[in-house]
Amino acid sequence: MSNLLALVVGFVIVIGHLGILVNGLGVNWGTMATHKLPPKTVVQMLKDNNINKVKLFDADETTMGALAGSGLEVMVAIPNDQLKVMTSYDRAKDWVRKNVTRYNFDGGVNITFVAVGNEPFLKSYNGSFINLTFPALANIQNALNEAGLGNSVKATVPLNADVYDSPASNPVPSAGRFRPDIIGQMTQIVDFLGKNNAPITINIYPFLSLYGNDDFPLNYAFFDGAEPINDNGIDYTNVFDANFDTLVSSLKAVGHGDMPIIVGEVGWPTEGDKHANAGSAYRFYNGLLPRLGTNKGTPLRPTYIEVYLFGLLDEDAKSIAPGPFERHWGIFKFDGQPKFPIDLSGQGQSKFLIGAQNVPYLPNKWCTFNPEAKDLTKLAANIDYACTFSDCTALGYGSSCNTLDANGNASYAFNMFFQVKNQDESACYFQGLATITTQNISQGQCNFPIQIVASSASSFSCSSYSLVVLIVWFLLSGMMF
């Protein structure tokens, strides 16, 4: 009996250590980075943290190979720049054959969804994909059906929350409607999803309600005590619930009030704005996850919600056009190490996730401002050059390195460039303004990182990154080829 008791206690301890993930919780795995972790390392990290659902932004062959046999549920994706091609049914069938059917075997990849585009109706795209998205969606789902996969793999379109809104005269969730300029396309999409028993996918970002809007009530972006907004007797105490239910009302208005909804992206960045930091991210997730863990839902959908957190890792090669925070959505740093306590079980415990194992780093070398430099007239131009080719978003207002002095700013910029260039000695010259040191030059909360050894499987290679930023640099400098 004592042996049995010990076995039971040991089992309970193991289960307690591993944790039980919030039902239906997944993560977005983006790969827009100059130095990527090996895909197999990332897959193991997901498994170590009991994350069993992952949403991709493509169907990269190396990534898919790493996912094979893992048992993880996978949402593969067709990027926006391929939507026009997918309006051809033959091309759609070929894509399904190469990226879905190919992995449909025991020990293959457990593909459950195909994301057709990513936020294709964003206003910033100026309508580029409005008339391509529905034909692409229909062709992909029909190709899945023809391949005999339609019951287990569903096509969906991840949409930004700007596809719906409430009128300024009645800004409450119950008045939610799809945007007038895309109501026709949205009705087509929703009707088609309904016929194929597929969900609609929406990306909700409470952080963006705060960003650049000092009039937005800060607490309303979180889950812990905002002044409620009343909508016909329903109190909304946070923008996530209000946003989600605005979609529910929009769906109801076009005859699909019961359509399943996936939250394709939701998260909080940790750098690049005064509200983007680890403390705020902890507060946000510590409010969101316990709600999901109890299947609390929202006032109009008071049940289970399928959610994919955004994102898994920081991505230093993403565009910062939306804002400097765009490279810092990860719950893990670029090297797979956790940033802040987060309890994916929804139990509200203050514990760190398990980081990536056996990550290879470059040597302990930094590039710093040369205090003996004489000609400082070229300093500003060299800092601009370094930041064009690397990620200096931590230097921005409200960010972790915002308090550095002029020399510190130069050192940070030079070091980020040096690391992106794999610590090549020629990348720490800057017309005599920089020098290499083996002393860690981090200051306070401002970390001067050492880059990881880039995965040989990286599809977004440093050389391709350099080509892109070189073109940008020439354009910024007004130079001609």
From Swiss-Prot:
It catalyses: Hydrolysis of (1->3)-beta-D-glucosidic linkages in (1->3)-beta-D-glucans. It is an enzyme of class 3 (hydrolase). Keywords: Cell membrane, Cell wall, Cell wall biogenesis/degradation, Disulfide bond, Glycoprotein, Glycosidase, GPI-anchor, Hydrolase, Lipoprotein, Membrane, Plant defense, Secreted, Signal. Pfam families: Glyco_hydro_17, X8. The keyword Signal applies. Residues 1-33 form the signal peptide. Residues 456-481 form a propeptide. Its EC number is 3.2.1.39. The active site is at 119 (proton donor), 265 (nucleophile). Contains two additional disulfide bonds. This is Glucan endo-1,3-beta-glucosidase 8. The keyword Cell membrane applies. One of its GO terms (cellular component) is apoplast. It comes from the Eukaryota. A lipid is attached at residue 455 (GPI-anchor amidated serine). GO terms for molecular function: glucan endo-1,3-beta-D-glucosidase activity. InterPro entries: Glyco_hydro_17, Glyco_hydro_17_plant, Glycoside_hydrolase_SF, X8. Coiled coil: none annotated. It is found in: Secreted, Cell wall; Cell membrane. One of its GO terms (biological process) is plant-type cell wall organization. Disulfide bonds join 367-428. Glycans are attached at residues 99, 110, 126, 131, 409, 440. Belongs to the glycosyl hydrolase 17 family. It is a lipid-anchor; GPI-anchor.
